[in-house]
Amino acid sequence: MTYQNGVEVLLEEFLDYLTKEETICSLEIEKLKVSIDELEKETDEPRVLQGINYFRTAKEVYQLSRKAYETKEEVVSEALILWIYENLWKGFNVPKGYRKSDMVIFGAKFSPPPPYVVPNLIRTIVNWLRNEKTIDVVKKSIIFHTLFEVIHPFPDGNGRVGRILLNAILVENGLLNVAFRNREKYISALREAEEGAIVVVEKLSRGRKIDYSSITETVEYYGNLNVFDELIRTEMMHSLKVYSNIKQVFLTPEEAAKLLGLKNKDYVRVLIHRGKLKAVKEEGKWKIPLSEVVKNFEHKLKGEEFKLANNLFKGKLSPS
């Protein structure tokens, strides 16, 4: 068994595998099937080329996001969004840039805003992303994703662009990109979460000024983000479980807290001291095996909630 430290190991060594899996799952959401082997081909067959374009585009974006994680920079920008769209449709006769006409989405609860407001809306949500510092990264990625999908800025491929951006936000903040393996669960989670985004986009489209904190509060108030949050963490833990069977990686309390969705590292220390999370201490610092983090998350999904962490959050316990 090989032992290594830190989430950055996962980002570096597991990225190719995860991005291939993500590509297959992301296209299956749109009922387009490609195989892992086909992603390595050179072809102009439209079905396969869409998969190749997604894989190559996503991988390059996540490599940029990984570097941004190391340098504490921000990778998501309007220029990146336009670049992703253009590269997803490389080799196809698809218009560049934002859509130039109104759009109707079959089965949606909303109508995307008129094309003339799209550029300003995209700049607004990018600025929101850069200025929002009060919520955890998974919730942040969900809010951005729902806002982007409601804006629906492009003639086609909005779901693909949006999922790459969601994952770029996760990777930029030290987490892994996720593959949504169940189409129905993804669509259901998106529908539950998007209610607040619909309210925000409608207000912004009418010229209303909304500050960044109000955007967050509105999306959280009207939309149910919890289902989407749990789906992302479940998919991430699925991937981590596969990886932990190959290689043993130790995480810091901060990294473990981020993966588990806990408020801060003190919650992790409480779980360690109470024997709920196995860890080792070296040179005065706790190191938690990735496999233990996965195990605890699985217990949580089965209904064995993190009662100690919740009690700490309510002020009933103090960290050791």
From Swiss-Prot:
Pfam families: Fic, HTH_17. ATP binds at residues 100-101, 157-159, 163. Belongs to the fic family. This is Probable protein adenylyltransferase aq_aa38. InterPro entries: Fido (IPR003812), Fido-like_dom_sf (IPR036597), Fido_containing (IPR040198), HTH_17 (IPR041657), SinI_DNA-bd (IPR010093). Gene3D superfamilies: Fido-like domain (1.10.3290.10). SUPFAM superfamilies: Fic-like (SSF140931). GO terms for molecular function: AMPylase activity; ATP binding; DNA binding. Residues 76-206 form the Fido domain. Its EC number is 2.7.7.108. Probable adenylyltransferase that mediates the addition of adenosine 5'-monophosphate (AMP) to specific residues of target proteins. Keywords: ATP-binding, Nucleotide-binding, Nucleotidyltransferase, Plasmid, Transferase. The lineage of its organism: Bacteria, Pseudomonadati, Aquificota, Aquificia, Aquificales. It catalyses: L-tyrosyl-[protein] + ATP = O-(5'-adenylyl)-L-tyrosyl-[protein] + diphosphate; L-threonyl-[protein] + ATP = 3-O-(5'-adenylyl)-L-threonyl-[protein] + diphosphate.
